[in-house]
């Protein structure tokens, strides 16, 4: 099967070779003989109603000293690619939204876009999880300090975080009696002008914030537990957490079964569920990571499984 695969990502020269999931995907695609084409967000544009890209043929290598090679740039309609991986990291800003508009045009013209552009817009990574109340801890979203204070008083120990953060940035823990609630709320809500999320604190975070990877609605059988550094409440690797790969628990599988059909329905082919203890806390749809860490521990070949799912979708068209 001859496949032309494009990727939209952050600069490939600056990725973390050991941990980058996009590189794992590209290596798996190239191993199948698929042709790779590299783009950054700035390379997408529209002309005469056609979404186009300034793209460069790409080769990738499993070599920490030289992991990519780019050829000369060409200008092509995006729909001439069979599949496009949208792997641009947050922030989820206007430029990200505009990129989804362009990718959606390519999708309408025949390209498979992973993940579906409309769902990237619709499924905020924190807010989307609130659709699954059977899986989540007590949670609320508000920008009013009085409503948030009521939640804090009810649960006594809570986490407060922005709806658009990543990597554990701007996450605060508030405990009953802490005098800093006012400044936390002012900072996160920007003085009542921005919605934020509050969740009951889960002490199970000490055992790790688990990243469960989902491929076409089905879980990879192993996850990465991201264990907080000493004195931290955030397990994110970007915040200094330590990753430990482990098999899924029965509760993890139950959560995946609750969420999976909705992901498949929305064209969310590759997703990361964040689970603390028995509770779903976030659903990461934009650029989920942790492929390489899990692969290294259990030889799961997650990139291959994702390419299998993509090939199946292309064959079904």
Curated annotation (Swiss-Prot):
Disulfide bonds: none annotated. The keyword Transport does not apply. Its cofactor is Mg(2+); Mn(2+). It comes from the Bacteria. Its EC number is 6.3.2.3. PROSITE patterns: ATP_GRASP. Mg(2+) binds at residues 282, 284. It catalyses: gamma-L-glutamyl-L-cysteine + glycine + ATP = glutathione + ADP + phosphate + H(+). One of its GO terms (cellular component) is cytoplasm. Binds 1 Mg(2+) or Mn(2+) ion per subunit. Keywords: ATP-binding, Glutathione biosynthesis, Ligase, Magnesium, Manganese, Metal-binding, Nucleotide-binding. Residues 126-311 form the ATP-grasp domain. GO terms for molecular function: ATP binding; glutathione synthase activity; metal ion binding. Pathway: Sulfur metabolism; glutathione biosynthesis; glutathione from L-cysteine and L-glutamate: step 2/2. ATP binds at residues 152-208. HAMAP family: GSH_S. NCBIfam families: glut_syn, PRK05246.1. Belongs to the prokaryotic GSH synthase family. This is Glutathione synthetase. The lineage of its organism: Bacteria, Pseudomonadati, Pseudomonadota, Gammaproteobacteria, Pseudomonadales.
